[in-house]
Amino acid sequence: MQHSKNYRKAAAAIDRSKLYTPAEAVKLAKETTSVKFDATVEVAMRLGVDPRKADQMVRGTVNLPHGTGKTARVIVFAAGAKAEEAVAAGADEVGTDELVARIQGGWLDFDAAIATPDQMAKIGRIARILGPRGLMPNPKTGTVTMNVTKAVADIKGGKIAFRVDKHSNLHLIIGKASFSESQLVDNYAAVLDEILRAKPSAAKGKYLRKVTLTTTMGPGVPIDPNVVKNLRENSAEG
């Protein structure tokens, strides 16, 4: 794969033989972003789990203290009073059968889906579309609920869901390159806390195998997975 001159220059600033602290990695990621727009900052983790085994699945949600830098588009499957509640809460689209039909037709212009429990039978018809994309409402992530107001507010406020893929990897957005270093470290710390809390008891050996921080179209910065405390040490902004 051919990389741009800017990418190669950015990659040259990263010492591949070194594992950086989260504060160092954030600083380096911000310094090496070369795109002309506000790049997204993402953390990728390789976990020591076998997601093919039900007792080693890692999934959950995390509330990013500073949000993702993007207002999530949220749809809600609800009817009657709950539909009105969802509209009042700021949901981008609200409906039942018509929403299902649109998704069956290929529409996927949203970041999260919420449903009241009575709508789940209908949503089952699009589970094969939503599931692989991490968009299927689920009680474990608080997206199958009667409290649609709270669910919409949480997601709009920076709550994101995570789920390990079949290769034992996790990918989570922790903000934008325009965020301050301390904001990005705070968001990284929140993610790390939840990933560690979600460790399955059946997982054996080293849990956090590899952690990398990247910006859109930028090189990865390797983070020391053993640094899980005092994450803001050495941060230029405290």
Curated annotation (Swiss-Prot):
Gene3D superfamilies: 3.30.190.20, 3.40.50.790. CDD domains: Ribosomal_L1 (cd00403). InterPro entries: Ribosom_uL1_bac-type, Ribosomal_uL1, Ribosomal_uL1-like, Ribosomal_uL1/biogenesis, Ribosomal_uL1_3-a/b-sand, Ribosomal_uL1_CS. GO terms for cellular component: large ribosomal subunit. GO terms for molecular function: rRNA binding; structural constituent of ribosome; tRNA binding. Binds directly to 23S rRNA. The L1 stalk is quite mobile in the ribosome, and is involved in E site tRNA release. This is Large ribosomal subunit protein uL1. It comes from Salinispora tropica (strain ATCC BAA-916 / DSM 44818 / JCM 13857 / NBRC 105044 / CNB-440). The gene is rplA.
